[in-house]
Amino acid sequence: MARLNVIGCGTGRSGTMSLAQVIGRCRGIVCTHEVRPLLPWEYDAKRYRRRLDDYLQSPDGSADVYFGYLPHLRRFFLDIADLKVLCVERARDEVVDSYMRWTGNANHWMEHDGTTWAYNWWDRCYPKFPATSKDEAIGMYWDHYYSEIRKIQAEHPSDVLIVPTESLNTDEGRHQIFDFLEIEEADRYHPIATVHHQGFK
């Protein structure tokens, strides 16, 4: 298999873990999910350089899926010549509802002082919005995320693919991903069971 550099993304609670599994079970590909150390949303030169080195120094390329890659994609495209970006998109209301259930008393999307909302390590991995409620902020995050990835797709139309989360459950959807990544037919992974929403991350 040719050298393959892949960044996967999506808002989180959108099928990113399932995407990593679909890619990573293809023959000859190792695809991780949210490999550490995670990049914060705001640019950190040291952490960025470490992730970049993982891509540049691996003889077979590298593949990782993490929602927090979005603000760094333009920089990655400048630094990685053969980069492919895959983004999964789940319905806005489903992402908001899932995050509301998943995060409890944490609020990653609004600035806070730790009284109403608990401080959480993941706070640094998300952008902040001037919302009046947590669910409103998550909705604003969804809007920002998919607006931005579509702008990046317009800049790199051959190297960015956005797929609906549901496509991970279909042969047609998985073939679209494999075709985009130029994975040979014999190396492709076809799961017996479908991916279910409760497994989305």
Show which residues each predicted segment covers.
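Short catalytic/ligand-binding loop motif for oxyanion handling, primarily in non-cytosolic enzymes
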Residues: T16-A20, L39-W41, P71-L73, D93-S98, ...
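PAPS-dependent sulfotransferase catalytic domain
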Residues: D44-Q57, F67, P71, N107-Q176
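Conserved phosphate-donor/acceptor-positioning beta-strand/loop module used by diverse small-molecule
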Residues: D79-W102
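The conserved 3'-phosphoadenosine-5'-phosphosulfate
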Residues: R36, W41-Y43, R92, K151-K201
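Short His-Asn-centered micro-motif
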Residues: C9-G10, A63-Y69, V88-R90, P164-E166
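PAPS-dependent sulfotransferase catalytic core
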Residues: M1-D60, Y189, H196-K201
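Short, surface-exposed basic-aromatic patches at helix termini and helix-loop junctions that form
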Residues: I23-R25, F76-D82, L86, F178-E182
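Short, conserved active-site loop motifs that form the nucleotide-linked donor/cofactor pocket
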Residues: I29, D60-G61, L83, S158-L161
